[in-house]
Design a protein with these regions (language model features):
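Extracytoplasmic copper-binding redox domains, predominantly the cupredoxin/blue-copper superfamily
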Residues: 1-75
């Protein structure tokens, strides 16, 4: 996924783990997760999808690798 992605409300984003390690998708920042989105651990070759229904900018990161982050812009 690019570090920034623009979508329209009610569109779904799918994260695909193309890595051998586990990852998560968590909205907010490492020191202040916002509780809106918290995936389980995503294993290698697995996918996680989420539909963004509201407009806004949603920062996300991986709880296991907090330097892996991005922003979904919904407008």
């Amino acid at each position: 996924l690019p570090t920034q992605l623009s979508i329209k409300p009610h569109e779904t984003v799918t994260w695909i783990n193309e890595d051998r390690g586990f990852h998560t998708v968590t909205t907010g920042y490492y020191d202040t997760p916002d509780g809106m989105l918290e995936s389980d651990q995503i294993a290698a070759s697995e996918k996680f999808s989420f539909t963004f229904n509201e407009s806004g900018e949603f920062h996300y990161y991986c709880r296991l690798h907090p330097w892996m982050e991005g922003t979904i812009i919904v407008s």
